[in-house]
């Protein structure tokens, strides 16, 4: 009988240790996933901030923002934005497009809202968010554009980057 108690006691202790280990693993995995989601949301918000442009922005500030935008994307990346931009972009093409954007736009306020991220694999994620552009072109007219955006993200060298963006019209 005492051997049975010892064995039963050992089994209970081992079972508790296994359950505690599994719980710690799940807790750690959940924390890492939340940390990745927060990092991706910060990436999207930072991209919107760096696409924002004021009339009085210095050249140095503009160059820093252009570099930050390019750094937010994987190389190559895919863009599907109506008539404005479509296809695969390497870093050089992306930088050239950013230069054209900044040359055409007098001022712009860009924002991202309702950012939802799903980690699909250890180094891959999908997301959706609403993007809003309110700006004035140097040629005069202003516009407000609101789009739903589907995004794919990849983690390279320990950092999340945008792999693709697909813009769709928002129904009013």
Spell out what each predicted region is:
Residues 67-85:
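Short, solvent-exposed secondary-structure junction/capping segments
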Residues 74, 112-114, 162:
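Hydrophobic residues on conserved beta-strands that form the core of alpha/beta folds
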Residues 45, 49-53, 74-78, 99, ...:
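Sec-exported extracytoplasmic/periplasmic mature domains
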Residues 13-72:
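Short, low-complexity N-terminal intrinsically disordered segments enriched in polar/charged residues
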Residues 34, 38, 60-63, 85-95, ...:
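Soluble non-cytosolic domains of exported or imported proteins
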Residues 93-139:
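Surface-exposed, charged secondary-structure patches
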Residues 2-5, 11-12, 29-33, 126-128, ...:
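Short beta-strand edge/turn micro-motifs at domain boundaries
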């Amino acid at each position: 009988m005492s051997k049975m108690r010892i064995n039963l006691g050992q089994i209970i202790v081992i079972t508790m240790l296994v359950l505690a280990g599994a719980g710690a693993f799940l807790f750690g995995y959940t924390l890492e996933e939340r940390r990745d989601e927060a990092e991706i949301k910060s990436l999207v918000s930072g991209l919107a901030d760096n696409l924002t442009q004021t009339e009085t922005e210095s050249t140095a500030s503009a160059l820093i923002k252009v570099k930050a935008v390019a750094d937010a994307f994987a190389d190559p990346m895919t863009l599907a934005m109506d008539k404005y931009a479509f296809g695969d972009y390497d870093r050089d093409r992306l930088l050239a497009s950013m230069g054209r954007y900044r040359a055409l736009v007098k001022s712009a306020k860009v924002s991202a809202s309702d950012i939802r991220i799903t980690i699909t694999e250890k180094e891959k994620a999908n997301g959706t968010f609403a993007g809003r552009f309110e700006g004035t072109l140097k040629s005069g007219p202003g516009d407000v554009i609101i789009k739903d955006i589907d995004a794919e993200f990849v983690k390279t060298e320990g950092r999340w980057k945008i792999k693709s963006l697909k813009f769709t019209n928002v129904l009013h």
